Amino acid sequence: MKLGFIGFGGAGYGLAKGLKAAGLEDVYYHDRMQETPPYAEVIERHAAETGATRAETVRELLARVEVVISCVTGAMAVSVAEEAVPFLTASHLYVDVNTASPRVKETVAGIVDKTGAVFADAAMMGAIPTFLHRVPILASGGGAEQFQKCMQPYGMNIRVIGVTPGQASAIKMFRSIFMKGLLSLFIETLTATHRYGVDDMVLGSIAESLDGTPFLETARVQMTKGVVNAERMAHEMEEVIATLEELGVPAGMSRASRETLLRCAGFGLRKRFGGELPSTLAEVLRAMETPPG
């Protein structure tokens, strides 16, 4: 198999490095910055390390490979696909690993499909420097199974989750709401606790509340409790915001929490559930699909 990368930055380099160690010999790349200092020197060094062969144009790259991985940025995903269109054929598998919205992946799929090439939306769910080519990947689209099959001999960790372009990226986007939100909560919380020298005590208190409870159960408890008590919690957050303002600590996450809780209170779920906590997460989500009439 001959594999090509459009874009040979950190992600492309990491994948190529791992694939070389796994025995893949025919790797090619084209990067629009390969002639532009200081990027050119880094790209050249990475190519030498991975044994990747440089292609001067996208046309040359696609003439040499069967599988091409678009490895640029989400903002460039569509334009790169459009640039590749004149040179894609039915013999190509086009894989987009860029971090982009499901709508962008759907657009890229539509562009690629018109050429007869097969498309796979691939969402990388871990750190490339840590995992290299074994980074967990979710794949969707018409070419997802083909992508999994052709990379299996090299140990890539690809899980096919559906045939619809955008599904894989949707999972990554929705997961990021939680993961980046959690980091933001740590930043805001610990910035404030540090002012009072109570870092360990606050973290210890949070740990007591969360440790020992399975994550899915934590999600159920928080959601079922939260929708019934959202209005009270929103008012409590007003005091939190006032405290942070007094300290001169940015309160962006606390304000967002208050607004989210107020929006949740607007569903009227406390009344709908008679003040009692619903027993399942599914009950909560169904009740929140549409506001009460």
Label every PLM stretch briefly:
Residues 26, 53, 93, 118, ...:
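Conserved beta-strand segments of alpha/beta enzyme cores
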Residues 100, 104-180:
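Rossmann-fold dinucleotide-binding core
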Residues 1-63, 88:
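NAD(P)+-binding Rossmann beta1-loop-alpha1 motif at the extreme N-terminus of oxidoreductases
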Residues 274-293:
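Short, basic/aromatic-enriched C-terminal tail that caps enzymatic domains
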